From Swiss-Prot:
Keywords: Cytoplasm, Elongation factor, GTP-binding, Nucleotide-binding, Protein biosynthesis
Residues making up the signal peptide according to the UniProt record: none
Protein name: Elongation factor G
Localization: Cytoplasm
Organism: Rhizobium meliloti (strain 1021)
Length: 699
């Protein structure tokens, strides 16, 4: 089977946004106009095509990024193939966003025209910057009360530090929003309400907007000619680029992430979606427009690149695992190079295991079609893989490569969970392991002392949904304890410890002496180890034992048994015995050495501090600030946003549980908040004593 669409006609993109910016609705409209959805699914009635998990339909928020393939005929009449990845906008699911950005070539950042740039917009924007993803901006909900396109443009500059190139101006706003002005063609598009947005009329720019349109077209040209010397010189001499040249420059600047073309409309009222789809074709990259993916050659350990080409060796990245009620476990993978046939054996280079591809599926939200072959640039769902988890590389066994791994954040909240009946015990273990394979930001462990099962995640909602999925998908009923904060421990001063481990009981004994300097490690690094041994006081082959010994006790600090952060250990001296010394003896010595030293090096308890943003009507500002202060919060500042006030604060996670209920009652349900993990900070001594007493009693 030959490739049906050329790789340059592919667009792999996602839609990223703050919760409630209308992401699912926009995706729905895209699927509707590209002919895949016959009835528009509304999030309001819980029937959106992309939101296919039950909890998503109930809660009206997108949790799992579903991949969808659809097709669109561009302005030139040529059909392009779109692979769209739906990403969640709720902060507890940033891992899903990070994961999908990793495999996208471009993205549409959605803004709510009323709220502009919101906290989660900043988060996903930063993640997209990290992966250098070209982005367009769609200012959605132009029909909403308080919609302000021009303020949104300003906020992009102020809050994201990004350059938005305005491509369209809105005609009217709020309930008077009728259509848009196209600043390249210099005409107006006005949608016909009766046609469900399928038809529009191209008319002249309204007289009262001509001047504004001229001004913004000038700004558009000024920005885009900067990336091309010849165009810049011609422009300075008074020669303007023609429309095709402008589009070419916008495309180049977008792909190089120099600026971001900005459009507007209202997906819910079906206005502005088709020009956005044309813009995806015109401005977002195909797989061959972006740099070839880099990886590590397993044989030589050198860096290699894999071009987006069917004739290159196969390489693909598994970016999502999902349980499907009909097919079982599905692995979503992006093929970067080569081609894949059903039934082929591939190598998982991270796990060093071979896997056989059983079925290969092309996904449309929650319907699917079997395919025999897939090519570079495709996003496919694979059935039958046993060992593969998120972030693994699958490739040609004869040309092994490891593509860069994704980084996953450490969980900040944990709860104890118990099955309600004996019969649920085994099923619960199975369910939790399945869910952990799907979601790397969710962890499961057993508390050694109490034997309880502990689950950890990115926030209360994240864990609620895990427990909920366990009940629905695996039919396991469980009771959950109160949420626990993921505290950490560190040391605050330098300390040198000399420790000798001796054991003599007939036969070969054990002997190892180590002298280690422990000191705080600069922020950002969990643990660093260095050996300054000269003259063989500790033989080279024993030094890994010293490092391993220290690392083995970092998981349980001296104060309350929490994992330790920010420790640097330098081995400066030691002694060994020709017969009695071994790697194990040095491991035992360094372990005991660190335990002794940790108490004397000013051990300190750390807690996760969250960045909290509250958006509240002015009447409740005093109450909100007072309440945040009572939670040990530090107010970072406040600003007006329309008629609301935005309060920024840093608050310990320990004091934020059930905050949503308090905020609702305090503001009669009118205030909202978002919360992101920001950093770890020392716990005040009075609070630290309570925590130590509580946890030491449990340990």
């Amino acid at each position: 089977m030959a490739r049906e669409y050329k790789i340059e006609d592919y667009r792999n993109f996602g839609i990223m946004a703050h919760i409630d910016a209308g992401k699912t609705t926009t995706t729905e409209r895209i699927l509707y106009y590209t002919g895949k959805s016959h009835k528009i699914g509304e999030v309001h009635d819980g029937a959106a095509t992309m939101d296919w998990m039950e909890q998503e339909q109930e809660r009206g928020i997108t949790i799992t990024s579903a991949a969808t393939t659809t097709f669109w005929k561009g302005r030139d009449g040529k059909t392009r193939r779109f692979n769209i990845i739906d990403t969640p906008g709720h902060v507890d699911f940033t891992i899903e966003v990070e994961r999908s950005l990793r495999v996208l070539d471009g993205a549409i950042a959605l803004l709510d025209a009323n709220a502009g740039v919101e906290p989660q917009t900043e988060t996903v924007w930063r993640q997209a910057e990290k992966y250098h993803v070209p982005r367009m901006i769609f200012c959605n909900k132009m029909d909403k009360t308080g919609a302000d396109f021009y303020r949104s443009v300003e906020m992009i500059k102020m809050r994201l530090g990004a350059t938005a190139v305005v491509m369209q101006l809105p005609i009217g706003a709020e309930s008077d929003f009728k259509g848009v002005i196209d600043l390249i063609e210099m005409n107006a598009l006005v949608w016909r309400d009766e046609s469900l947005g399928a038809q529009w009329d191209v008319v002249e720019i309204p007289a009262d907007m001509k001047e504004k349109a001229e001004e913004y077209r000038e700004k558009l040209i000024e920005t885009v000619v900067e990336i091309d010397e010849a165009a810049m010189e011609a422009y300075l001499e008074g020669t303007y680029p023609d429309n095709d040249k402008i589009r070419e420059l916008v495309r180049r600047g977008t792909i190089d992430v120099k600026f971001h073309p900005m459009f507007c409309g209202t997906a819910f009222k079906n206005k502005g979606v088709q020009p956005l789809l044309d813009a995806v074709v015109d401005y977002l990259p195909s797989p061959i427009d972006i740099p070839a993916i880099k990886g590590i050659d397993v044989k030589t350990e050198g860096e290699i690149t894999r071009k987006a080409d069917d004739n290159e060796p196969l390489s693909m990245l598994a970016f999502k695992i999902m349980n499907d009620p009909f097919v079982g476990s599905l692995t979503f993978a992006r093929i970067y190079s080569g081609k894949l046939e059903k039934g082929t054996s591939v190598m998982n280079t991270v796990k060093e295991k071979r896997e056989r591809v059983g079925r290969m599926l092309q996904m449309h939200s929650n319907s699917r079609e079997d395919i025999e072959e897939a090519f570079a640039g495709d996003i496919v769902a694979l059935a039958g893989l046993k060992e593969t988890t998120t972030g693994d590389t699958l490739c040609d066994p004869l040309k092994p490569v490891i593509l860069e791994r994704m980084e996953f954040p450490e969980p900040v909240i944990q709860i104890a969970i118990e099955p309600k009946t004996k019969g649920d015990q085994e099923k619960m273990g199975l369910a939790l392991n399945r869910l952990a394979a799907e979601d790397p930001s969710f962890r499961v462990k057993t508390d050694e002392e109490s034997g309880q099962t502990i689950i950890a995640g990115m926030g209360e909602l994240h864990l609620d949904i895990i427990v909920d999925r366990m009940r629905r998908e695996f039919k396991v009923e469980a009771s959950v304890g109160a949420p626990q904060v993921a505290y950490r421990e560190t040391i605050t001063r330098k300390h040198e410890e000399d420790y000798t481990h001796k054991k003599q009981s007939g036969g070969t004994g054990q002997f190892a002496r180590v002298k280690i300097v422990f000191e705080p490690n600069p922020e950002g690094e969990d643990f660093a180890f260095e050996s300054k041994i000269v003259g063989g006081a500790v033989p080279k082959e024993y030094i890994p034992g010293v490092q391993k010994g220290i690392e083995s006790v970092l998981s349980s600090g001296p104060l309350a048994g929490f994992p330790m952060l920010g420790v640097k250990a330098t081995l400066i001296d030691g002694a060994f015995h020709d017969v009695d010394s071994s790697v194990l003896a040095f491991e035992i010595a360094s372990r005991a050495c660190f335990r002794e030293a940790a108490k004397k090096a000013g051990a300190q308890l750390l807690e996760p501090i969250m960045k909290v943003e509250v958006v509240t009507p002015e009447d409740y500002v005093g109450d909100v600030i007072g309440d945040l202060n009572s939670r040990r919060g530090q107010i970072q500042g406040q600003e007006a946003r329309g008629v609301a006030v935005v309060i920024n604060a840093h608050v310990p996670l320990a004091n934020m549980f059930k905050y949503v209920d308090n905020l609702r009652s305090m503001s009669q349900g009118r205030a909202q908040y978002t919360m992101l993990f920001d950093h770890y900070a020392p716990v005040p001594s009075n609070v630290a004593q309570e925590i130590q007493a509580k946890y030491s009693g449990q340990k």
